[in-house]
């Protein structure tokens, strides 16, 4: 703490960036602690920096194109081929074409809607919250102009932290997550319903729900039929499982992913989340 906040109210951005680079989980955990500091100046500064620093740190390096199939379509700038029909249409509007009037076609990935569903039951501190923040940051880093991102937290109730049609930058949800306070019980079925409601509002044809949970629900309906119905409606339900030594918890996560027709990834550390997200959405 002293390395990144050498004096009251001060925050060393360079030291904090170094901490995130050296250890994403520890650096994010430190940033969360700073965002909940008693010093209001330090707290506000940490929350201001959170999205700006965690999202780039959570980006998967070496991944040239985010996951998903690609198709040929209009692209900005110079693409692989001149779109002659679209360019001639511009010529019909104005006899004097400029470089900016040329229309190109290239490979682009169709838009996709991703809804991150966060288990916020119990005390939302420590590793679960750190993992949730890193996961949201990884998704924000992957969200392109044609994509949609929603974030929902649940315990005995469900709270939409970012609606799927939110015009704000995806990274803005990080600040809302830092202020998250959860509850004691776990209504996974209710959380799934809220996430699927957001998926139903999406414009993208491809829709994925990613559930970050230990799989242990102790309130509400059975979530498996809800996940199965989602898969039948072409919305896949994936699970990022917070690793647990309890066989029952691991089995619950396995069953949920299978019912939702999605992928299952076990996370031992928050730093594993970006790569897990990339595998799920490839």
Regions found by a protein language model. Name each.
Residues 80, 84, 113, 128, ...:
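Helical mechanochemical/support elements of P-loop NTPase systems and associated helical scaffolds
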Residues 215-259, 265-267:
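VWA/integrin I-like adhesion module and closely mimicked acidic/polar interface patches used
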Residues 108-167, 170-212, 217-221, ...:
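Von Willebrand factor
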């Amino acid at each position: 703490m002293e390395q990144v906040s050498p004096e009251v109210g001060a925050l060393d951005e360079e030291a904090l960036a170094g901490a995130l680079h050296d250890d994403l989980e520890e650096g994010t955990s430190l940033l969360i602690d700073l965002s909940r500091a008693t010093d209001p100046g330090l707290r506000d500064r940490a929350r201001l920096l959170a999205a700006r620093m965690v999202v780039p740190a959570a980006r998967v390096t070496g991944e040239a194109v985010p996951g998903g199939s690609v198709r040929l379509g209009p692209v900005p700038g110079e693409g692989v081929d001149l779109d002659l029909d679209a360019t001639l249409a511009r010529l019909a509007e104005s006899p004097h074409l400029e470089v900016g009037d040329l229309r190109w076609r290239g490979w682009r990935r169709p838009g996709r809607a991703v809804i991150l569903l966060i288990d916020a039951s119990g005390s939302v501190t420590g590793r679960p919250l750190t993992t949730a923040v890193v996961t949201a940051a990884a998704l924000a880093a992957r969200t392109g102009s044609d994509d949609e991102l929603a974030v929902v937290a649940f315990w005995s109730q469900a709270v939409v932290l970012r609606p799927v049609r939110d015009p704000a930058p995806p990274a803005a949800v990080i600040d809302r997550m830092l202020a998250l306070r959860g509850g004691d019980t776990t209504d996974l079925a209710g959380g799934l319903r809220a996430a699927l409601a957001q998926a139903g509002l999406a414009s993208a044809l491809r829709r994925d729900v990613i559930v970050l949970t230990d799989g242990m629900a102790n309130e509400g309906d059975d979530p498996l039929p809800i996940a199965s119905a989602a898969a039948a409606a072409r919305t896949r339900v994936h699970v990022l499982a917070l690793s647990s030594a309890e066989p029952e918890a691991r089995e619950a996560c396995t069953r949920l992913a299978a019912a939702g027709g999605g992928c299952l990834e076990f996370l031992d550390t928050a730093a594993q989340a970006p790569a897990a997200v990339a595998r799920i959405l490839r």
